[in-house]
A protein has these predicted regions:
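A sequence-level detector for low-complexity, Ser/Thr- and acidic-rich stretches
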Residues: 1-114
Length: 114
């Protein structure tokens, strides 16, 4: 789509992995001008099906995300914690209100670190 950032990740092997995905915007404002004001993150499988959506990371999975040590620094930022089977995935970052700006998608394999 237009005005979105798309990041891809591949889970290889024969066993699933747990990932933490962060969608940042406001916390980048100290060093970058024109950041996304209210990032929303969507996780899709290889068929394009939505697996998870998050707008404000504290709205869902707050305790689990905090326990990883990877909680976004700003309450308006997004995060998803998801167990994924081997395959291809995309994370789509946009602004919940349609604004444009600079954002960052981070994907961490946290299997075994929970």
């Amino acid at each position: 789509g237009e005005s979105v950032m798309i990041a891809g990740t591949i889970v290889g092997g024969t066993t699933g992995q747990t990932v933490a995905i962060r969608g940042l915007g406001p916390s980048l404002a100290g060093s970058i001008a024109g950041t996304l004001p209210d990032p929303q993150l969507e996780l899709h499988d290889s068929f394009g099906q939505v697996i998870a959506i998050n707008n404000n990371w504290q709205d869902t999975q707050a305790a689990e995300i905090s326990a990883t040590g990877l909680a976004p620094p700003n309450a308006l930022e997004s995060a998803i914690l998801a167990p994924l089977l081997p395959g291809n995935y995309t994370a789509i970052l946009s602004d919940v209100n349609g604004a444009t700006g600079i954002g960052l998608v981070e994907i961490y394999n946290i299997t075994g670190n929970q």
